[in-house]
């Protein structure tokens, strides 16, 4: 993962806006951001998005701490830098556009990896609080749930994903913590073609496997406990390479601070998740300034 400057991040965001110029959703989100009433936006949506992505490269998991840093050291670039309250409101207003940005990057990744035939599927828990605070947690009480991973029980969400052998993420989706991995396999692989390798949690019924095979996706998963099933050496080798997508989760959580347990609102929580994911996607070699520039 290479370092990146604020200017580079801004160029990527700017190319995204130019690429989708005239798009109804983009124009709608932009109108909603600036609004007709309320306080004046001293920073454009491009600036807000670039700054919020950049803060994860600077490893500021706390938005207020990053605001203090930006207000002090980025004053030359942003002379009219808003106070924290206005910065927070502008950041929340940019959240719908950031969701569109992340989905657009994933779509571009799938385009660039169209020739790939090997894919890895996995999920990772995204805790919203520690287990001893579950009964007191209020922010995500109505949508988060208890789940169990290989490390034990947790309360929160699951992030399901697909990546290539080169760690290029092709698809991501959030579910509650109680959703079984196997229920997401078809949805995750609907836009890819080739062989998909997963752990024993992705045991699927033969009817589902047949439907996926008709769509060009051939699912291979590690055998569960007490299961006697023959698999080829090639399949076994690829199943053992599932640590590729586990490395993706490790980098997202360690380098880009995906897990966040101090959110004060559900919108603020998912805003943090999506900006963290956006920073990770940009950090990948396939996602530089030419991402939204036609070939």
Regions found by a protein language model. Give the residues of each.
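Short alpha-helical elements
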Residues: 1-295
């Amino acid at each position: 993962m290479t370092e990146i400057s604020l200017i580079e991040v801004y160029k990527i965001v700017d190319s995204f806006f130019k690429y989708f110029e005239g798009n109804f959703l983009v124009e709608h989100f932009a109108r909603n951001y600036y609004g007709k009433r309320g306080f004046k936006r001293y920073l454009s949506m491009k600036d807000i998005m670039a700054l919020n992505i950049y803060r994860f490269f600077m490893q500021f998991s706390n938005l207020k701490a990053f605001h203090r840093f930006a207000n002090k050291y980025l004053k030359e670039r942003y002379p009219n830098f808003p106070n924290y309250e206005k910065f927070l409101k502008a950041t929340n207003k940019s959240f719908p556009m950031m969701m569109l940005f992340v989905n657009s990057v994933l779509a571009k990744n799938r385009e660039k990896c169209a020739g790939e035939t090997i894919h890895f599927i996995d999920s990772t828990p995204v805790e919203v609080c520690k287990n001893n605070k579950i009964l007191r947690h209020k922010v995500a009480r109505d949508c988060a749930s208890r789940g169990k991973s290989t490390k034990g029980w947790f309360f929160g969400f699951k992030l399901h994903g697909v990546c290539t052998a080169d760690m290029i993420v092709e698809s991501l989706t959030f579910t509650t913590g109680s959703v079984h991995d196997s229920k997401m396999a078809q949805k995750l692989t609907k836009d890819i073609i080739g062989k998909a390798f997963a752990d024993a949690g992705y045991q699927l019924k033969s009817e589902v496997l047949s439907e996926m095979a008709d769509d060009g996706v051939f699912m291979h998963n590690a055998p569960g406990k007490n299961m006697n099933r023959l698999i080829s050496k090639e399949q076994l080798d690829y199943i053992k390479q599932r640590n590729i997508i586990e490395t993706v989760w490790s980098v997202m959580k360690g380098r880009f601070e995906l897990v966040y347990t101090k959110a004060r609102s559900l919108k603020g929580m998912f805003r943090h998740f999506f900006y963290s994911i956006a920073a990770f996607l940009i950090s990948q070699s396939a996602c530089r300034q030419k991402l939204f520039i036609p070939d």
